[in-house]
Amino acid sequence: MVDVLYLHRFDPETALDETLETFAMLREQGKIRYLGLSNFAAWQVMKAAAIAMQFDLGISILQPMYSLIKRQAEVEILPMCASEGIAVAGYSPLGSGLLSGKYRRGESGRLSQDERYAARYDDKQMHVAADALGALAEELNTHPATLAVVWASRHPAAPIPIISARSTDQLMPSLNAMHYIMDDALYERLAALMPGPPPATDRSEET
């Protein structure tokens, strides 16, 4: 049995009721436990949730991209999940390795080997933030990857960072995040390294 089966991307060409009916059938057959979504906008999640109710299904977990330098999920995705009781498993907490400091050390990775990833992080502010994170990690005598993973888990929606690595040496700093205590002051200091996304509405100053 599969614990969580994800719809990896919203498909405008396929009716959601057909897809979710299939998920319901798979659950009835004992093949899956929970339904998850990945790379869905907030409105797409709520549309899926409304249709899923027809089949006695719920959206259990959402998998958005989320890191110190990719924070769009803070606008609607993370608040929605907190409101609706949907778990969050954020992927790419290291920004495809940019926040690990490995590119500063001259190591290779997705950003240097894949044009799609290079384009995704082709933003000077992201690279400035990554450099500042590295300097702060040195100041605190820790690894930048540790700080990045802890930061990505500290949002009030309690995201669970999805970590990955090509070697044990790369993996350990991320695992060390489990034991690193980050207070509010450090969390805010890290958050200030990269401008947050604009709010979902244009009159938020009136609230």
List each language-model region with its residue ranges.
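Short coil/turn segments at secondary-structure boundaries
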Residues: 201-206
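Acidic/hydrophobic-patterned starts of short beta strands in beta-sheet-rich repeat architectures
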Residues: 4-5
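Beta/alpha (TIM)-barrel catalytic core signal, keyed to glycine-rich beta->alpha loops juxtaposed to Asp/Glu
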Residues: 10-197
